Amino acid sequence: MRVTLKLATSLDGRIATATGESRWITGEAARLEGHRLRAGHDAILVGVETVLKDDPELTARLPGRSVDQPLRVVLDSRLRTPATAKLAGENTLILTAVEPQPVGAAQVRRVEAEDEDGRPAIPAVLKALKAAGVDSVLI
């Protein structure tokens, strides 16, 4: 499986401002490249804290082009993703360490292997993604 990390930081090496704001620390060209990266992967993976703080859509949007949308994946050990989240619809997979409960129209699966902190272990996450037909994931 191909795993790609996309990361943006400010000049001082931070990923958010002192007040916790993290939206738009990059410019338009970098955001477009981020959407190209999204379109080039089978899945986009975020943690539940990103969902709670940013409520992202996690879609690939390229001007003038229609693209197949990647599977949206949320690592959510305690199943805190709100049913009202923008990504709590179809084409979303939530991987959790607790008994699965409905979250909007998203698929929710328990990942059996957990790390010492009670979170899904990365090898188990990759195995679950592979089982979902994912060959490449953008983090």
Feature names for model-found ranges:
Residues R2-L11, I15-S136:
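Active-site ligand-binding patch in enzyme domains
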Residues I139:
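Gly/Thr-rich phosphate-binding loop signature of adenosyl cofactor/nucleotide-binding cores
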